[in-house]
Amino acid sequence: MADIPPDPPALNTTPANHAPPSPPPGSRKRRRPVLPSSSESEGKPDTESESSSTESSEDEAGDLRGGRRRSPRELGGRYFLDLSAESTTGTESEGTGPSDDDDDDASDGWLVDTPPRKSKRPRINLRLTSSPDRRAGVVFPEVWRSDRPIRAAQPQAPASLPGIAHAHRRSARQAQMRSGAAWTLDLHYIRQCVNQLFRILRAAPNPPGSANRLRHLVRDCYLMGYCRTRLGPRTWGRLLQISGGTWDVRLRNAIREVEAHFEPAAEPVCELPCLNARRYGPECDVGNLETNGGSTSDDEISDATDSDDTLASHSDTEGGPSPAGRENPESASGGAIAARLECEFGTFDWTSEEGSQPWLSAVVADTSSAERSGLPAPGACRATEAPEREDGCRKMRFPAACPYPCGHTFLRP
């Protein structure tokens, strides 16, 4: 607490004995003057008290008439600068008895009429702990800092999902198969690969024919192994459309290592020329190829002929290879026509709802446009709207069988 002396003019105009000290700025405490006791009133003359009271009242009246307010400096007040707030860390010592300020006020002739003070929270001195913390921008109270080192937050492993675990096991198994020298049969891996190929072939122009081709391939590979008919390493390279490079070397090494563990059967078949096709070899590994563009060679068979009927016919003749002229030309042509019709009408949706499929105008009469209001009939041959029958069908140009797709049409056998 620092005392600032008042101005000299204020000392000259106001008596020192009767200038009450000003309370601290911002405090709203009601003060009342101390009533003199009987002994003091008898010792002091009445004239002195009356003269001092008149002088102070005249000064206050003059200040009010002038329209200005006396500053604390002119009133002989004191400025308070609390420097103990930044150094104290404990509770302030607040007693129930009168404090030093109260003694000063009482000695100056004033008594402070204030309510009892409440207990305050302990003040915490905020300080920066050390230079590394300051460089890192860490600001926190020193009393909260513990001596134990802060543990580094360890990242928790994500919860393992069934699909992720399954993919991890599959990738580990594939890596083991690649790195392992000995070949082992893995039926689960073969099943997954075949299933993936079936899913890829769903985007083909003819998914059923492509799927049947894959079935033929897996079946022929099994029968070739069952009959102990083996191919040479170079023949396998031509069959898998790899010529030279890392894949060719790996394929030859794997085949030779497996053949060394078994007794040699017949001589390997090596008479397999390269496929005379427009897309062969490395071009098969390039995406976005035209599947329907250009003319194909004789070796490329249409997917339309690979139907379920042809698969069954091939399975019936598994005993031995059939000669080239064994098939009847008429049956072959009839099978091609049947396969073509099956390809065209295989995806035909036979539903009983009107307007569900774009029906052919040559087979089924179009009634949706005639039912629209405000549109005239496009031709005289179109039948006018007839009353509905009990079964919900309409009587049209075909009296024998109603072509409306309700399940009783001539298109359904």
From Swiss-Prot:
Q: Where in or outside the cell is it found?
A: Host nucleus
The similarity annotation says: Belongs to the herpesviridae ICP22 family.
Q: Which residues carry this modification: Phosphotyrosine?
A: 189
PTM per Swiss-Prot/TrEMBL: Tyrosine phosphorylated.
* Keyword Zinc-finger part of the UniProt annotation: no
Disordered: annotated segments:
1-124, 289-334, 370-390
- Main location class: host cell
Q: Pfam families per the record?
A: Herpes_IE68 (PF02479)
Record has Membrane as a keyword? no
| Extra facts | ICP22 and protein US1.5 mRNAs are transcribed from two different promoters on the US1 gene.
Q: Where is the composition biased (Acidic residues)?
A: 297-309
Q: Please give the InterPro entries that the UniProt record associates with this protein.
A: IE68
Q: GO:BP terms for this protein? A: protein ubiquitination; regulation of gene expression; symbiont-mediated suppression of host innate immune response; symbiont-mediated suppression of host JAK-STAT cascade via inhibition of STAT1 activity; symbiont-mediated suppression of host JAK-STAT cascade via inhibition of STAT2 activity; symbiont-mediated suppression of host type I interferon-mediated signaling pathway
Q: Where is the composition biased (Low complexity)?
A: 84-97
Q: What does this protein do?
A: Functions as an E3 ubiquitin ligase and plays a role in the inhibition of innate immunity by preventing IFN-mediated signaling. Induces the ubiquitination and degradation of host STAT1, STAT2 and IRF9, resulting in the blockade of ISGF3 nuclear translocation.
Q: What is this protein called?
A: E3 ubiquitin ligase ICP22
**What keywords are assigned to this protein?**
Early protein, Host nucleus, Host-virus interaction, Inhibition of host innate immune response by virus, Inhibition of host interferon signaling pathway by virus, Inhibition of host STAT1 by virus, Inhibition of host STAT2 by virus, Interferon antiviral system evasion, Phosphoprotein, Transcription, Transcription regulation, Ubl conjugation pathway, Viral immunoevasion
Q: Where is the composition biased (Basic and acidic residues)?
A: 62-76
Q: Which domain of life is it from?
A: Viruses
- What metabolic or biological pathway is this protein involved in? Protein modification; protein ubiquitination
Q: Organism source for this protein?
A: Human herpesvirus 2 (strain HG52) (HHV-2)
- GO-annotated cellular components: host cell nucleus
